[in-house]
């Protein structure tokens, strides 16, 4: 009896396991292409690489504004100092003295969508040029406002002096009116003089009295004219003194500030005390405030008092001239190093201390010289004993010398 073929599989028996192939037996498992190859599917031994730690938010992201404003104060802070003074006298300058933030430069981004790469590159490339133009414009505006304020102050002072002089002139008029009531005294005085001349008690004539009185009046008028002439020229001198003295004082203040800034960055070149650190990972700067470095580079860090208040970032220098921010978790602090100025000052202080103690130094020198003389004497004595000498040696003077 022939063998019968096996019955066809039932529908429930043809159900395949997910991931099974079309043929019999378990097929290959499928894997999404988005996942990519794993370590188990890579050929060969997997390479272990050091993954740099994540960078903390940059200063621009922490402050919510442009990174330029972190270490570079806005010029609006300088010109806003005239705002309180200019609101009463120069209201037209107050909108100009608050900067250009309303025009869109350095504005806060309200939308969550990041700008395109072209816009970012354009802003980064044009930032320095616009800042230079802005500083020049603010400088001219500040100078013009200063001159306008100086003119107003001098003019107000001049008006105050004129008001005082006007009050004094009015006071003089009032006193003249009061003294005019004493005309009777003058009449009595005139009659008394006439009586003295008639009786022969006074030998002066009336003409001489009139000439003397006129000379006194002319002298008083000349003094008043000279005082008025000299009083007319002092506002001009005061105005030019303020105009020339103001910029000079500003220049002195700015030069002092630049010297302080130069002294404050001497740590970068190693002149002052600084902290030494070694880079552990590579870092590429993305803004002008940051500096790039590679693993193994030695960096000079500013002291704690000179560090900016930015979380996770340190102020450092790589070449001794350019300073910038670096991530704190990318470097390893090695320690504090004294600057060259400190070392030189310590050497000078030691030399001064040695000069202030001459007796100790002199005693040490004398002791050293005595030791050297004794050592030299011993060496000479030993060499003399080694040299064979005749028992009777004749010196230069013809006498015998015993050694």
From Swiss-Prot:
Recorded topology in the membrane: Multi-pass membrane protein
Main location: membrane
Transport found in the keyword field: yes
Ranges where the record places region Targeting to peroxisomes: 145-233
Keyword annotations of the record: Disease variant, Membrane, Peroxisome, Peroxisome biogenesis disorder, Phosphoprotein, Protein transport, SH3 domain, Translocation, Transmembrane, Transmembrane helix, Transport, Zellweger syndrome
Region (Disordered): 1-68
Origin: domain of life: Eukaryota
Membrane-spanning ranges: 135-155, 175-192, 234-254
Record localization: Peroxisome membrane
Residues with the Phosphoserine modification: 354
Cited InterPro entries: Peroxin-13_N, Pex13, SH3-like_dom_sf, SH3_domain
Keyword Methyltransferase in annotation: no
Listed Pfam families: Peroxin-13_N (PF04088), SH3_9 (PF14604)
Ranges of compositional bias, category Polar residues: 59-68
Domain SH3 as annotated: residue spans: 272-336
GO terms of molecular function: protein transmembrane transporter activity
GO biological process: cellular response to reactive oxygen species; cerebral cortex cell migration; fatty acid alpha-oxidation; locomotory behavior; microtubule-based peroxisome localization; neuron migration; protein import into peroxisome matrix, docking; protein import into peroxisome matrix, translocation
Membrane topology (Peroxisomal matrix): 1-134, 193-233
Entry's Gene Ontology cellular component terms: cytosol; membrane; peroxisomal importomer complex; peroxisomal membrane; peroxisome
Purpose of the protein: Component of the PEX13-PEX14 docking complex, a translocon channel that specifically mediates the import of peroxisomal cargo proteins bound to PEX5 receptor. The PEX13-PEX14 docking complex forms a large import pore which can be opened to a diameter of about 9 nm. Mechanistically, PEX5 receptor along with cargo proteins associates with the PEX14 subunit of the PEX13-PEX14 docking complex in the cytosol, leading to the insertion of the receptor into the organelle membrane with the concomitant translocation of the cargo into the peroxisome matrix.
PANTHER family noted in UniProt: PEROXISOMAL MEMBRANE PROTEIN PEX13 (PTHR19332:SF1)
Similarity annotation: Belongs to the peroxin-13 family.
Annotated disorder: Peroxisome biogenesis disorder complementation group 13: A peroxisomal disorder arising from a failure of protein import into the peroxisomal membrane or matrix. The peroxisome biogenesis disorders (PBD group) are genetically heterogeneous with at least 14 distinct genetic groups as concluded from complementation studies. Include disorders are: Zellweger syndrome (ZWS), neonatal adrenoleukodystrophy (NALD), infantile Refsum disease (IRD), and classical rhizomelic chondrodysplasia punctata (RCDP). Peroxisome biogenesis disorder 11A: A fatal peroxisome biogenesis disorder belonging to the Zellweger disease spectrum and clinically characterized by severe neurologic dysfunction with profound psychomotor retardation, severe hypotonia and neonatal seizures, craniofacial abnormalities, liver dysfunction, and biochemically by the absence of peroxisomes. Additional features include cardiovascular and skeletal defects, renal cysts, ocular abnormalities, and hearing impairment.
UniProt-recorded name of the protein: Peroxisomal membrane protein PEX13
Organism: Homo sapiens (Human)
